[in-house]
Amino acid sequence: MKNILLGCSMLLAMTAYASEPNRADVLREKILSGDTSEVLVVAHRGDWRYAPENSIAAIEHSIAIGVDIVELDLQLSKDSVLFVIHDSKLERTTSGKGRISDWTADSLRTLKLKNGAGIRTMHSLPTLEEAMLVAKGHVLVNLDKADRYFDLLMPVLEKTGTATQVIMKGNKPAAQVDSLYGAYLDKVIYMPKLNLNKPDARELMDGYFNELKSVVYELSYSNDDAIGYAMELKSRLDGKALIWYNTLWDTQSGGHDDDRALNDPDGAYGFLIDTLGARIIQTDRAELLLDYLRSRSLHK
């Protein structure tokens, strides 16, 4: 009897553990529910200041320090295998030369990545499948340069069981998004990108808001000509969707960028959060942003 009871207790414990949501599930729910209690941090190209951009090591480091989303880029090999790399050519970030589309997957696997200073490292060029298996259960993944590959990447996401961890983005009009990708939008999160300085920004936004009903929007503006509309969107999206800003360079967020944050984090990150309603920020300085948010009790 004692052994039976012990066995039942262990089974119940294992069942409870298995049913607990993983961190990626929790983060996805924060976005879907419009949770504004914290600010989510996105590591651009997987935190390239620590390890080669778009590398497995960069993803692992991002997870270790508490990043919520890693942004990764996709390119396609000659034999239609998706690799995690930003440029269409190999020279800047790898030991290879030429266009990725001229190399087979097996040949790309022989290359080594370069670090931020352009020095060859021992890190290899990862496939999308390899990257998603590392991220699985730990962190959300924003796939950039990827909407052109939707039909190729979805089988990879299904195979790895990571489709619900992915945020896709693009700037096509709402009707086109629904026509091209509608079959996938119940799994991946689709995020419209909107440049507020462009003349058609309001028309595009109305389409996204009324037709797609997206749960997150990536907004950008280069100067104060668009600050009024940015503040208007803060009110319009309040309680309906989260706002994402990039602080990678000054023309993406009206000068409230990572470089400014080195000496004036309140004027950079604080402005985007408090004045423009940002609840997701993509950065090239993930640890700096995390420290700032934690000092304000805006991140665990």
Where are these regions (language model features)?
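Hydrophobic h-region of N-terminal signal peptides that target proteins for export
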Residues: 9-18
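Phosphate-group recognition and catalysis centered on beta-loop-alpha active-site segments
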Residues: 17-300
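Positively charged n-region of N-terminal signal peptides that target proteins for export
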Residues: 1-4
